[in-house]
Amino acid sequence: MSLMTKLGFRALVASCLITAGSAANAQVNVLITGVGSTQFPIATANFTNEANLPQQVTSIVRADLARSGKFTNIDAGSTPVPETASVDLGAWKAKGANAFVAGSVNRDANGQYKVNFILYDTVKQQSLGGLSLTATDTTLRTAGHKIADYIYQKLLGVRGVFATRLSYVIKTGNRYQLQISDSDGQNARIALSSTEPIISPAWSPSSTKVAYVSFERKKPIVYIHDLPTGRRYMVSDQKGNNSAPAWSPDSNTLAVALSLTGNTQIYTVNANGGGLRRLTQSSSIDTEPFYSPDGRWIYFTSDRGGAPQIYRMPAQGESAGAAQRVTFTGSYNTSPRVSPDGKLLAYISRTGGGFKLYVQDLQTGAANAITNTNRDESPSFAANGQYVLYATQSGGRNVLAAVPSDGSAPPQILSVQGGSVREPSWGPFMQ
């Protein structure tokens, strides 16, 4: 959510229902709108014994690879090829595939599935190994995502993020839903449904909890939702506004923005709701905190220089060292997010009457716009730092978009039929 929206919180009457185990009716759909300049050609043969499965693992793998923008799927025909088959790698290379995947899905006596596959490098004429996974009817999609992750890492040298999850807020009519889904928008579940706004979801680094802000008690309050149990609990209900939760790397602490004493300032609170501590001591508005992955710094938005810019301070607060300005490109910058490796800063900059997603190299200070949209907000890095998820507008609708963090390909649009989707947060690698 934008800085000005966060600073203009209104008290709203709420009616809220927790539905942790409910399947989502409104589901995010992915539209592949562009690909990278260089794509890796790969052929994924149909896995054996897939005909009557509730989920086609092969289709999930192919879709993941295509969605990444890093691969092009070479037609592998309709004949299933098990991982145990003897494969003519030269023939597949001649068809234009630099890699080939074969596999099988077998159901055991307990009703579980054994998913096996092997990955070949057709150029070097060698096996790159594979996995043997156990799945159920409900986790076959996850198995497909894990296979795609394996392929991505083996061929590109970077860990894949297909088996990670997203959180976002869908608004349909007068109802808001906080949803949790797979990285492709499928398998969506409703964590919270309310007639009042839900904003600022934030994943814990442990991948088991999501913090968010709900207006259900006539004011913004910070809650934590425990995903394994479906239980949620209040973390910050201080006087005034409670907003912008951000997790520490150890998942034990949240940085929050509170208007407890008037102007919004940065505080920390234990994940159990205790131990409130003030970090900033300015007469300006300090908001939108975000921890660096090493836990040393907190980045935040402040107008202490006259207009919103990104600053950083020691994680212990300004008492341990003065805040330092980080952004110098543009006169209005908000919504800091640091990449998982600590090298990049994503933020939103007001540019030419619109708002665009920028990425800055934290070592050199070089910053560039990486999108072709101009109503951007709420950036969130993928766990491998290769992509940034953000909210924007497309065709007059509120949608999500994912773009390579180097801006090398156009955004892929994630939309919902009959509604709008905002407030994205890309989850960490699954524990």
From Swiss-Prot:
Going by the UniProt record, its keywords in alphabetical order are: Cell cycle, Cell division, Periplasm, Signal
Entry keyword annotation includes Cell wall biogenesis/degradation = no
Question: What Gene Ontology terms for biological process does this UniProt record contain?
Answer: cell division; protein import
Name its cellular compartments.
Periplasm
InterPro entries of this UniProt entry? 6-blade_b-propeller_TolB-like, PD40, Tol-Pal_TolB, TolB_N
Family affiliation: Belongs to the TolB family.
Tell me the protein's name. Answer: Tol-Pal system protein TolB
Q: Which gene encodes it?
A: tolB
